Curated annotation (Swiss-Prot):
The lineage of its organism: Eukaryota, Metazoa, Chordata, Craniata, Vertebrata. A zinc finger (RING-type) spans 433-482. The active site is at D1350 (proton acceptor). This is Mitogen-activated protein kinase kinase kinase 1. Residues 1224-1489 form the Protein kinase domain. Gene3D superfamilies: Leucine-rich Repeat Variant, Phosphorylase Kinase, domain 1, Transferase(Phosphotransferase) domain 1, Zinc/RING finger domain, C3HC4 (zinc finger).
Length: 1493
């Protein structure tokens, strides 16, 4: 490097430099031993001899360098001493050395900028070398040390003299102009950066070795830190061709800047005095955070998912986030943001760092305000960069793009190091997404503007931009060149990578498969309803690539990609779209195939197995792909997505025909994975999800009678369904879940538990009423039951506690249900014995205890081992169909008598003995020798439902309800002896309560009462009698912890869980006998009925008696009854779009009725007020008639006069002339517009006073004239059809010569604006009167699909009485294309007075009727304070006012003296969001207009 310096120095013409170069080259960059002393000696001699000549030369050189090179000031280094090894080390003090040494103090006047070495030849290079060698000489070298201070002082003085002479030189003007774009000198910038990063600098003398190795090491280190690795000898002093190389040498050793700053201290001060800028830079500029926090914030901004949506003002941007609702306005200059998070928020830093591309160390980044020239400079650079990308790309750019597309992973490492600065900058720009302002990597999903600038963008960023365009109702355009995007489908130009699919989106969207025209066409037709394009293309995980291929073929890449989105909203929308597409495809396929195949197998899913047409094949493939999708999406953890998946499942099933057995088999096979997924969801931790899953499968069990009936929505489908209960049972039992997969087991067990309760007729035929037809033999039904119990028996020993306990509970509760069929009960005991379970002994004890309860223990012990089939007849005989009014004791006696001929006298045994024995069984007391057991639980709280299953038949429910003998008068009598026996005793387990027991009659009364309470929609006569041996209620919520008390009102919901099913009344008895009977909760409760509910206070007194039993009862209650109003069913969540849950709480109903009445009353009052307003609107004064302006029906309202040229066809020819100054006279001017004038006029023939609006239609070009004529005709014809008391009326219109004359009725009171200027602000009563009339007129216009768009005081006319207001001047009015309020066809048109215009109009967004409502609020402000809103009279610059309103975050200030009512009206009108403003018709219902002022 030093050799190169020597060569370059010798070419400059200095002999000393040429003489020094050989030593420099031979030394290889290392100083010789005597180099430093020799340089110091030469420096001392030259200082005394040739000072004046050198000073003159320095001044000339300084002028030259500064005048030419100060444009490099932002890149100039802090100190020049960071050069590489000094090239000049001559052993003898030659004149060249001396000259170099004397000039070594040149930096005292100011450091040469980078590039000075190349322009000044070797002299400046040796200056630095000699200066370094002299400055760093050892302490022992006295002559150089003594000479150094004197030389510096001399240089300082002479430099100052030269600087004073530069003040009036023309170079100074150039320097100032060069400094306009700079804000802070680079030395100060670097100094601040180093100070923040390294803290205070401690200056220490650095001893330099005699051989100069310290300086060599320093230079080498500096060189190593540089970004450009070229072989230049002085990276700090050369002029680099790359802009990135100038800051590369600004970092050196931590201690070196301190030393140099001390020795060359005049540098910053002198440089500051050389070129004082004409405009000082903005103040501050220091980061308010610590260096670490500053770095963290900058890094956060560089990674933030923010997007530049558009520039919405001269100095403002609209910044968006991933969510379409997150938009923020960033204002440059004031440096603030609409997010309200204070200065230097992430959005402002995003604009500064990524939009303006400032360096993180740029002081402008941390300024709280920027001056105008700084803002202009930033925007100028931004727009120049942006416009450079819009220009047509060069051939080289296109070739590079093509090469990158074809070979993305073969980037050469050397290709980035050999490019010029301009090409590198442009290449960097091309590799940056213009929306997120981040680089585009090869592995990212990219798209390209194909019809415009051909710039690449991120797919995700483009989807954000597409959503913005969609919300603004704009066509999708390129955010750079504004050219129209080819399609709403974003074509994937992503480069091939292991993650991406090789098939592009465009290829997928083409109808390459026979399924595409069916599903794809439906999807495209309904794109407006279920538009997914604005979500962009979502990446499909690699694990699902192969699985998703048939999905893509059937439904398209766009929809399938959204199913894998990380945003649950996108997934939900995709499922809604999928539901729509599939139902449409199935309808289309079914409709076309039924005509060809004749119905038998037409439209089937068997892919042509039953029919040879292609249409069934299409629908079959769609269903197959659809079921595959559902098997995955039904596992979604988000509840709303899961609901959407079930809705999609229903949509598919109800439109899928199934006529043959083959079709049923195929449909069963396709649905099997879906059902398996839902089975797992039955044990979901989310209670709503588990309830909904169980309810869904119950609907499937109902077959063609349920909500999931196959082909339900197809007319005359005649589908046979998928099999109902049998199919669900096959799904439960078919795939035997592994024992380690506890979720699958628990989900199946939860469903089994619910099935046995909800559709008990399928499993317990002995308790079904005789009038219920039995489709299947009893044997088959019992086999179903046994298969389920065998499945539960397999899981009794499961390691997962919840699985094992629920299995045991199901088994025991089913055993209790079949006690009336002793052979079946015996079969259960046998199955338990054969299982070899570790719980065998305990389970058998509990089974025998159940047998003892119902007095069939002897039957079991006598060896009733007959097979189930052999005992069916006796089983039927043992189970009478119904016992509507028999007590539990009587029924037990009946079973005993008819079953095995047991003695009826057995009933006379002491009830105390039975109660004591079975209470111990039920409670599981430690003192009970027969029922000793731990405290297992099915729920997480650790309490088993099974502990409640074995309640004593005689354990009195009266324990909880002591006063229930009176209410029930319809209960039949029972034997007195039974009553006496039961009433004498109480179970030993409940002695501390001291509450007398209840009689069986009382028990039965309570049971019947409770039955009426719980059975909302059931016919109690069809239900079985109240069994004392009862199974527990369902446990769909078995997996989650419950509240410690029953929820008030929960009993009234009991029937909901078992609606439309053969729910046994023993369910009620299980609550009565087991839950309340076994000494459970409270001794002070009342009978549950429709008017009463359980409260925590009622069961509190029994809590400490037996917490085990209390907990079990509580679990039974909560498992059997919905604990609150949030019960989730398939019908409430899926089948009905807007579910209305039946409420049985009378208090709630009363509240609802009361509120409903209040609401109805208020609505009636509003409607009455509106009727009055409309009635007042109907009162219309007579309009004077001018004969010459009348036209026949069907003729054009515009009458063309005779002397008018025939250039305007379509008008009515005048039968009678009506010319100015002849038939009518023009009076004083009352208004003036750009192309129109308004005058008072009088009809000569009738004397009618009129106002005439004369509009000239002549323009410079014919096309412009045609537009004007068409607009005038539209205005005239519009006004001719308007007839309302608050709308100005037109008498007629003529076309005469070059003018259109619009004759309108005369309003003598002039305009509201004129009255305000003449009389001042109105009183509030007047404001309310005028506002109401204004709203009436606007309501009439809006109902006729007209928006005025120019509502202001100048266009509101008052009649001669001052009481009637009419809306005038429809020059800006336009007719809406539809009757929808949100029509937005007038985007970008700035019509009307600015101060009264809505922000969305000024922003160029879509607008509709709501813009007139905003103007009403502005008119209220104008009438209340006689000034337009926004202090518009103080704004002489219309653009500034537009910007103020368009960027406003609050409504204009409302006068404080307004009453609350009128203030509320104004605030409603001035809602910033158009959709939040009420329609004018709704505002008329406001109470302020119903009050007499």
């Amino acid at each position: 490097m030093a050799a190169a310096a020597g060569d370059r120095a010798s070419s400059s013409g200095f002999p000393g430099a040429a003489a020094a170069s050989p030593e420099a080259g031979g030394g290889g960059g290392a100083l010789q031993g005597s180099g430093a002393p020799a340089a110091g000696a030469g420096l001392l001699r030259e200082t005394g001899s040739a000072g004046r000549e050198r000073a003159d030369w320095r001044r000339q050189q300084l002028r030259k360098v500064r005048s030419v090179e100060l444009d490099q000031l932002p890149e100039q280094p802090l100190f020049l001493t960071a050069s590489p090894p000094c090239p000049s080390t001559s052993p003898s003090p030659e004149p060249a050395d001396a000259a170099a040494g004397a000039s070594g103090f040149q930096p005292a006047a100011g450091p040469p900028p980078p590039g000075a070495a190349s322009r000044c030849g070797s002299h400046s290079a040796e200056l630095a070398a000699a200066r370094d060698s002299g400055a760093r000489s050892p302490a022992g070298a006295e002559p150089p040390s003594a000479a150094a201070p004197s030389g510096r002082e001399m240089e300082n003085k002479e430099t100052l003299k030269g600087l004073h002479k530069m003040d009036d030189r023309p170079e100074e003007r150039m320097i100032r102009e060069k400094l306009k774009a700079t804000c802070m000198p680079a030395w100060k910038h670097e100094w601040l950066e180093r100070r923040n990063r390294r803290g205070p600098v401690v200056v220490k003398p650095i001893p330099i070795k005699g051989d100069g190795s310290e300086m060599s090491n320093l230079a080498a280190e500096l060189q190593g830190e540089g970004q450009a690795g070229s072989a230049a000898p002085a990276p700090k002093g050369r002029r680099s061709p790359s802009p990135g190389s100038s800051p590369s040498g600004r970092s050196g050793k931590p201690e070196s800047p301190g030393v140099r700053r001390k020795r060359v201290s005049p540098v910053p001060f002198q440089s500051g005095r050389i070129t004082p800028p004409r405009r000082a830079p903005s103040p501050d500029g220091f980061s308010p955070y610590s260096p670490e926090e500053t770095s963290r914030r900058v890094n956060k901004v560089m990674r933030a998912r923010l997007y530049l949506l558009q520039q919405i003002g001269p100095n403002s941007f609209l910044i968006g986030g991933d969510s379409p609702d997150n938009k923020y306005r960033v204002f440059i200059g004031p440096q603030n943001c609409s997010c309200g998070r204070g200065t230097f928020c992430i959005h402002l830093l995003f604009v500064m760092l990524r939009v303006f591309q400032l360096e993180p160390s740029d002081p402008m980044l941390w300024r709280k305000t920027l001056k105008n020239f700084e803002v202009e400079s930033l925007f100028q650079k931004y727009h120049s960069r942006r416009s450079s990308r819009i220009k047509a790309p060069s051939r080289n750019t296109i070739q590079k793009f093509v090469s990158r597309m074809s070979n993305c992973h073969t980037l050469s490492s050397s290709s980035t190091s050999t490019s010029s600065s301009e090409n590198s900058i442009k290449d960097e720009e091309e590799q940056m997404c213009p929306i997120c302002l981040l680089g585009m990597l090869d592995e990212e999903s990219l798209t390209v503007c194909e019809d415009g600038c051909r710039n690449k963008l991120h797919h995700h960023c483009m989807s954000i931009w597409a959503e913005e365009c969609r919300r603004n109702r704009e066509p999708l355009i390129c955010p750079l060149c504004r050219s129209k995007w080819r399609s709403h489908d974003f074509y994937s130009h992503e480069l091939s990578s292991p993650v991406d699919s090789p098939t592009s989106l465009r290829g997928v969207q083409q109808p390459s498969s026979p399924q595409q025209p069916v599903a794809g066409s439906q999807r495209r037709n309904q794109e407006s309803n279920f538009n997914l394009t604005h979500y962009g293309t979502q990446q499909i995980p690699p694990a699902y690539k192969d699985l998703a291929e048939p999905w893509i073929q059937a439904f398209g890449m766009e929809l399938v990609g959204c199913l894998f989105s990380r945003n649950w909203n996108v997934r939900e929308m995709a499922l809604r779209r999928l539901s729509h597409d599939v139902s449409g495809a199935l309808l289309l396929a079914n409709g076309e195939s039924t005509g060809t195949s004749g119905g038998g197998s037409g439209g089937s899913l068997s892919a042509g197995a039953a029919s040879g047409s292609s249409q069934p094949s299409i629908s079959g493939d769609v269903v197959e792909a659809f079921c595959s999708v559902l098997s995955i999406v039904c596992a979604d953890p988000v509840y709303k997505v899961y609901v959407a998946a079930l809705k999609t499942l229903r949509a598919m099933l109800v439109y899928t025909p199934c006529h043959s057995l083959a079709e049923r088999i195929k449909l069963q096979r396709l649905l099997r994975p879906v059902v398996d997924t839902i089975l797992v969801k039955c044990a979901d931790a989310n209670s709503r999800t588990s309830q909904l899953s169980i309810s869904t499968l119950l609907e499937l069990c109902k077959g063609q009678a349920g909500e999931l009936a196959v082909g339900r929505e197809i007319l005359k489908a005649g589908s046979i369904g998928v099999g109902g209960v049998d199919y669900v049972l096959s799904c439960i039992l078919g795939n035997q879940a592994e024992s380690n997969n506890w979720q699958e087991l628990l989900g199946r067990l939860c469903l089994i538990d619910r099935l046995l309760l909800e559709i008990s007729a399928e499993f317990y035929p002995h308790i079904v009423s005789t009038d219920v037809s039995q489709a299947e033999p009893v044997e088959i039904r019992y086999k179903k039951l046994l298969s389920l119990l065998a499945f539960a028996l397999q899981s009794i020993d499961n390691s997962h506690s919840m699985v094992g306990k629920l299995s045991r509970r199901i088994y025991l509760s089913s055993a209790r249900m079949v006690t009336t069929v002793p052979p079946l009960f015996s079969k259960l005991v046998t199955m338990l014995s054969a299982s070899g379970s570790s719980h065998f002994a305990r389970m058998r004890r509990r089974l025998m205890a159940i047998a003892d309860e119902v007095e069939i223990a002897e039957v079991i012990q006598l060896g009733s081992e007959d097979t189930l089939d052999g005992q069916q007849d006796s089983s039927q005989a043992l189970a009478p169909p119904r016992y509507p009014e028999s007590s539990s004791l009587e029924h037990t006696a009946h079973v005993e008598k008819t079953g095995k001929g047991l003695k009826a006298t057995r009933l006379s045994a002491s009830s105390e003995d039975i109660s004591d024995r079975l209470a111990g069984v039920s409670v599981g007391l430690p003192s009970s020798a027969t029922t000793e057991q731990p405290k297992p639980t099915v729920q997480t709280k650790g309490r088993p439902h099974s502990q409640c299953l074995n309640s004593s038949p005689l354990s009195p429910p009266q324990l909880m309800f002591p006063a229930i003998s009176a209410p029930c008068s319809s209960a039949p009598s029972v034997p007195a002896g039974s009553v006496t026996d039961a009433s004498k005793h109480r179970p030993r387990a409940f002695v501390p309560c001291k509450i007398p027991s209840a009689s069986p009659q009382t028990q039965r009364k309570f049971s019947l009462q409770f039955q009426r309470t719980c059975s909302e929609n059931r016919d109690s006569e069809k239900l079985s009698p109240v069994f004392t041996q009862s199974r527990p209620p369902p446990s769909s919520n078995i997996h989650r912890a419950k509240a410690s008390r029953p929820v008030p009102g929960s009993t009234s919901k009991l029937g909901d869980a078992s609606k439309n099913s053969m729910t046994l009344d023993l369910n009620s008895a299980s609550q009565c006998d087991d839950s309340f009977g076994s000494g459970s909760n409270s001794g002070s409760a009342v009978i549950p009925s429709e008017e009463t509910a359980f409260t925590p206070a009622e069961d509190k007194c029994r809590l400490d008696v037996n917490p085990e039993l209390n907990s079990s009862i509580e679990d039974l209650l909560e498992a059997s009854m919905p604990s609150s109003d949030t019960t989730v069913t398939f019908k409430s969540e899926v089948a009905v779009l807007s579910p209305e849950k039946a409420e049985s709480d009378d208090t709630y109903k009363d509240d609802v009725n009361h509120n409903q009445k209040c609401k109805e009353k208020m609505e009636a009052e509003e409607e009455e007020a509106l009727a009055i307003a409309m009635a007042m609107s109907a009162s219309q004064d007579a309009l004077p008639i001018v004969p010459q302006l009348q036209v026949e029906n069907g003729e054009d309202i515009i009458i063309i006069q005779q002397d008018t040229p025939e250039t305007l066809p379509g008008h009515t020819k005048a039968n009678e002339p009506y010319r100015e100054d002849t038939e009518w006279l023009k009076g004083q001017q009352i208004g003036l517009g750009a192309f129109s004038s308004c005058y008072q006029a009088q009809d000569v023939g009738t004397g009618t006073l009129m106002a005439v609006k004369q509009v000239t239609y002549v323009r410079n070009t014919s096309s412009e004239q045609e537009e004007v004529v068409e607009a005038l005709r539209e205005e005239i014809r519009m006004m001719s059809h308007l007839n309302h008391p608050n709308i100005i009326r037109m008498l007629g219109a003529t076309c005469e010569k070059s003018n259109y004359n619009l004759f309108i009725e005369w309003m003598a009171g002039a305009s509201v604006a004129h009255l305000l200027s003449k009389y001042g602000a109105f009183k509030e009563s007047v404001v309310i009167n005028y506002t109401e009339q204004l709203l009436r007129g606007l309501s009439y216009l809006h109902e006729n699909q007209i928006i005025h768009r120019d509502v202001k005081g100048a266009n509101l006319l008052i009649d001669s009485t001052g009481q009637r207001l009419r809306i005038a001047d429809f020059g800006a009015a336009a007719r809406l294309a539809s009757k929808g309020t949100g029509a937005g066809e007038f985007q970008g048109q700035l019509l009307g007075t600015i101060a009264f215009m809505a922000p969305e109009v000024l922003r160029g967004q879509q607008y509709g009727r709501s813009c007139d409502v905003w103007s009403v609020g502005c008119a209220i402000i104008e009438m209340a304070c006689a000034k337009p809103p926004w202090n518009a009279e103080k704004h002489s610059n219309h653009l500034a006012l537009i910007f103020k309103i368009a960027s406003a975050t609050t409504a204009p200030s409302i006068p404080s003296h307004l009453s609350p009512g009128l203030r509320d009206v104004a605030l409603r009108c001035l809602e910033l969001q158009p959709q939040d403003r009420p329609p004018s018709r709704e505002l008329l219902k406001h109470p302020v207009f119903r009050t007499t002022w």
